[in-house]
């Protein structure tokens, strides 16, 4: 479980005024679980809900909010949009791309 990233996601969700400070920093790691929850991974959302005391719905909303505000910020480069740094391995870029497509593609089930 990635408690560190969960704490960051929930902090931004609870206090949106912190978005600007997080946008100015390198992305926290690992980002894949955040994208997985946004893409509908109910098991991970339930695990995080149990660890945090939040509802699964709030966990999912917090992940979506985090991604919208931090990855898709104006001026974000292509790597940041994928939830990675410029030195990320190709496999991570592919994984994040697939997860983002699962979340955002209009033909998703």
Regions found by a protein language model. Give the residues of each.
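Short "pre-J" leader segments immediately N-terminal to J/J-like domains in DnaJ-family
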Residues: 1-80, 86-94
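The canonical J-domain HPD catalytic loop and its flanking helix-turn segment that engages Hsp70
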Residues: 81-84, 95-109
């Amino acid at each position: 479980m990635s408690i560190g990233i969960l704490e960051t996601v929930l902090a931004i969700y609870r206090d949106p005024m912190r978005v600007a400070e997080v946008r100015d920093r390198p992305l926290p790691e690992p980002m894949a679980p955040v994208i997985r929850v946004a893409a509908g991974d109910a098991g991970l959302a339930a695990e995080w809900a149990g660890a945090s005391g939040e509802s699964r719905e709030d966990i999912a909303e917090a992940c979506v909010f985090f991604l919208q505000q931090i990855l898709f910020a104006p001026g974000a480069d292509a790597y940041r949009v994928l939830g990675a740094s410029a030195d990320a391995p190709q496999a991570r870029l592919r994984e994040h791309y697939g997860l983002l497509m699962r979340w955002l593609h209009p033909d998703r089930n």
